[in-house]
Amino acid sequence: GVRIGAPTGVACSVCPGGVTSGHPVNPLLGAKVLPGETDLALPGPLPFILSRTYSSYRTKTPAPVGSLGPGWKMPADIRLQLRDNTLILSDNGGRSLYFEHLFPGEDGYSRSESLWLVRGGVAKLDEGHRLAALWQALPEELRLSPHRYLATNSPQGPWWVLGWCERVPEADEVLPAPLPPYRVLTGLVDRFGRTQTFHREAGGEFSGEITGVTDGAGRHFRLVLTTQAQRAEEARQQASSGGAEPSVFPDTLPGYTEYGRDNGIRLSAVWLTHDPEYPENLPAAPLVRYGWTPRGELAAVYDRSNTQVRSFTYDDKYRGRMVAHRHTGRPDIRYRYDSDGRVTEQLNPAGLSYTYQYEKDRITITDSLDRREVLHTQGEGGLKRMVKKEHADGSVTQSQFDAVGGLKAQTDAAGRTTEYSPDVVTGLITRITTPDGRASAFYYNHHNQLTSATGPDGLE
């Protein structure tokens, strides 16, 4: 948790998509990662972009498993847990970011992640606040609600709106029902006031789940969800109609995985159901479709032509731990793990393979041509950084970081050092000094946009 006086907004780990190796693995985490694969992105203002990220890393304070199954996250899986003295923001990389409790109108800023978390409850932020103008782009009801939280990683937006799902009360429930101890993503608002809305079911078996999205262009997407029992019945019907022996497909899944609680609800397809520009010309097939293993793991991705474009295989013992993935028409890339769940081997039959050896503050990467790199690290959790790299050719490069993980200096293989001076508040680079002592300066406006730069020769 967060201690009084500790920096707020510190993550439980480095970003899974940061330092990567091969196809790809994050050696600082020992995790198999897929930083981002986009399945759906129609152009327009504030468009609905459906992308998938995978990480085998397991946080100690996970959000529930999302509709893409264990290990996978999509942007809509952002979630805020409200604990007694701590706010835990679960990002779409499977990590936990820890903030101190906020009062209405108060904000927390993560310097290491460049992320603001603001609690509603005030019509305006202080005039000098970096988010004051962006705050005014929000509808008044969002700004004034102390029960909503808003997050952004830029003074230019967009806002991620964290609220709760309105639900149908039970017959014997005492009203008004208390709000849940968490907040989920209900929409996005950009700096022009345009909105993207996530429609969540108010009741029934999919209560609280996203079943529809309206983007900034007014297009409406329907997200088709399935339960484990429905997928099991479909598998039995397909087996009987094909005359095959039905596979073992359980009607229920265990309620908990290493990646969090699991209700077994999965996304099976996304349809475009309304387009104001082409209301009579809607596609007759889903824009993307997903296939699932009997254990509720993402097995396949099909595009709008119903062509399989991706396939995934998982460990028999550990649900959600990816051991192979493949692009259609290419060979499987396979992975092996140690007893701590860290990737030790990456096998590529059509290219370089890698092995990973983990020691305290040191990771050794060896490829199939017997070339070796050694990464030396400092820090823990979200502030872990690579401070020295021994390259395969014998050269060494080094880096220095400040207390919040920002880069201060880099020394190349010849011993030449370049220094970086970040702004204390924003983390933006304001000055770069090259090894010969020549300096360049950079200036920004209130929205963190670069407005001017001065070179070593004084020219602006």
Where are the model-predicted features located?
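N-terminal targeting and processing segments
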Residues: 52-53, 74-77, 109
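Short, polar loop/linker segments at the starts of domains and inter-domain junctions
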Residues: 59-73
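Short alpha-helical segments and helix-capping/turn motifs at coil-helix boundaries
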Residues: 32-37, 73-75, 81-85
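Intrinsically disordered, low-complexity segments enriched in small residues
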Residues: 1-63, 94, 136-142
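Solvent-exposed loop and beta-edge segments used for protein-protein assembly and interaction
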Residues: 42-44, 81-83, 145
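Extended charged/polar low-complexity repeat regions
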Residues: 68-70, 85-460
